[in-house]
Amino acid sequence: MEKKPFYITTPIYYPSGNPHIGHCYTTVACDSIARYRRMQGYDVMFLTGTDEHGLKIEQKAAEKGVTPKEYVDEVVKTFKKLWSYMNISYDRYIRTTDDYHIETVQKIFKALYDKGYIYKGEYKGKYCTPCESFWTESQLDENGCCPECHREVTEAKEEAYFFKMSSFAERIEKLLTETDYLQPKTRATELVNNFIKPGLEDLCVSRTTFKWGIPVTFDDKHVVYVWIDALSNLSLIHISETT
């Protein structure tokens, strides 16, 4: 009898520094579920990995006097050493600097562009460097700071490519409200109320203000931003490759 597949992933961790108790918490939680499902007879795929591009990595590497790749290589060693020490039973560790991941992301970006789902525009907004996130004025906290880390944000404007997220607003709302796709249900309601009902905005998917990223093949001034870079890691779309 063929085993039923079960896929589980940790967050794809950002290696701007060494792992801490928060990384351990989520990884142990996933490991526990993966082990339980294996005991039940499922064919488990347990993924973890690191999201290794972006401005913060570029800045950290410059502070240390090394290249971004040299910097993340050392931090990743610490992550893997910790998971080995804790006997974490992951099946794959995917790094966004892996050659096969880079090739896959470039193919995805080009395919979306060719199909008209990605277009070039200009982004204006409040930017938080530690979180590598843009925010609208209404999303800032009561002090006008980043709603995630509560640090100061800067005014930013740059040429960028955008994914037509707004075209999928109705489909996403239906998925969140009429299915159990996202649990707990309170999170689904939160997404609908905070992002879809006010008017779902298109998603910035490239950057020009830093170089440490996956180049856009048809426009080398741009690097692919986290929403397509890191999230493609989670999809396991390059499953045929080896780690």
What residue spans do the PLM features occupy?
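Structured secondary-structure scaffolds
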Residues: M1-T48, R95, Y100-T104, E155-S240
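A broadly conserved sequence feature marking short terminus-proximal activation segments
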Residues: Y71-Y127
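Short low-complexity, flexible loop/linker segments enriched in glycine and/or proline
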Residues: Q59-E63, K107-K110, F134-S138
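Cys/His-rich short segments
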Residues: Y117-A169
